[in-house]
Amino acid sequence: MYKIGLIIVICILWSIWPQFGFRKDLQIIFCDVGQGDATLVQLGTFQLLVDGGPPNEKAIECLGRYVPFVDRTIELVVATHQDSDHIGGLNSVFANYHVRELVWNGEEKQTADFLTFSQAIQREQDSGMRVSIVAHASEINIGSNLVATYLFPRVARFSNATQVSHKCETHLQDITDTNSMTDMSSNDGSIALFIRYKQVTILLMGDQETTGELTLSCLGLLEPMTIVKVGHHGSKSSSSMEFVSQTQPEYAVISVGKNNRFGHPSPEVVSRYDLFRSVILRTDLLGSIELLSDGDRVWREKSLFDI
């Protein structure tokens, strides 16, 4: 009985140890926030939070589980776009952590959650938080071989592309027209993030749909990926066959709520990733998903908290 008790104690301590210190491996945590997105990228003392999920406390609970409790600073928060299931939980993040910099797309939306978000931005900016609006594809070198690039289809420019097909030429010319950009779905205004850590590549697609995917493809910004956070929760409006065939991720992660009213993820989308033998990981089935990388390989971390 003593041995069994000792084993249980060791297992518990092992599972909660990350809360007491900083890991040397890159951590990518896809938080289970229900129907929404919140992704934490963590390397040493650096944290990047992409979106904060809907207006509930699930993102904060996820951060409390994975960010060492001695660290109350998040270096960078990226709000991919203004939908409530992506920005709704950020007010709680601002209230519980010191955020050094916020990056967002600068587009407004007439909702209560966006009003709360914009008020929080002003409050935190007055307290010293830097705020940046993405105006072009830009790269940030985080250090320790970790580089992130913002990809923003709304501000793509035809001059960035070379040797494009007629289809791409027409598409890129269309989206550079002001009226066409206005007509684009707000989902296609999502900031996508391309992250490279040594040999490992990660693409976080926000809610980008097929128009945004085609833009990234035409600009030559898509390549085989190690990890893809599937766009728009696995909706059939995203993850075209062209996109999936170009990225062919080893891991396809779908952030989605249980029994959601939208029917996400689409079986058609799931079958496309299956076709390319991607390991499909879903938050509605697995809860929060933690992937670790040493820069050469990726593996899934499991704990006693896993479903």
Residue map of PLM features:
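Non-globular, low-confidence helical/coil segments that flank catalytic cores
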Residues: M1-I307
